[in-house]
């Protein structure tokens, strides 16, 4: 039976990424060695990581004055690495979900944190708006997409202080103006590659302005100086990420994949709004293009488990909602084909016919 992968992360990868990485694990670049065996100091690896950085910058139109890093530790390590490097006195944070909350908790170890707004009272079902960022903040931190609650900031925010963004789950999904940001970070395991590598885009002029000593492993300047090789980098995830970037370029780049993402999300949201069994949980204007969260309508709550089992029997994988929300979550990242969305919609319609009279 065909499987349709809606996992929230690690998640679906382009088939080209899977195939090329599998071949490289057997024999990397005709070296006679596995990708897992090569030295990160070898010429082949140097060429590969340099190509990855060049293509990463090209696809996002990253201007001069910014560095790109590939590190370990996941986005969770960035929750403390960002304030370690940037927070001197105080910083502003927008609390739009679970990951933003965790970032705030870590940042409070380093200085005063101003939570400018939060949607916690509504279980993070919308993106807070109409807040004021103190002009003396060292930076303003946002989480652009919330995988658990299915909300997303769909535009580049204007900020009078350096803007820091966790873009773990929507990087490369839509065009962004890098020059509006001081630092962008994220785990790769949504739209870039497998788990194990973290990307950081940082404006060089922001660094070196805090008075505290920074451990070498947590100092962006050290990693920039050593070209992401201060310690052994995550070789296999970086290679797989390069394959995804190549795939993205063949599609036509970020602008083209953004069009496809809007089409996929619209198709699924329209079915959720039409279908008598289901309803969305996120504010309509803040609905994520990456993570579509929905629950059963109140009168059909007793069918939640039945739909989960029914969908699984039809090949749907990973649609169970997070425990904080319940219901269902379809993660529809760049690599997910529209065919998978159509399959899920077909399952929803079939289930509706079974359980709703007059359909």
UniProtKB/Swiss-Prot annotation:
Its cofactor is pyridoxal 5'-phosphate. It is an enzyme of class 2 (transferase). Binds 1 pyridoxal phosphate per subunit. Its main location: cytoplasm. Pathway: Amino-acid biosynthesis; L-serine biosynthesis; L-serine from 3-phospho-D-glycerate: step 2/3; Cofactor biosynthesis; pyridoxine 5'-phosphate biosynthesis; pyridoxine 5'-phosphate from D-erythrose 4-phosphate: step 3/5. Catalyzes the reversible conversion of 3-phosphohydroxypyruvate to phosphoserine and of 3-hydroxy-2-oxo-4-phosphonooxybutanoate to phosphohydroxythreonine. Homodimer. This is Phosphoserine aminotransferase. The gene is serC.
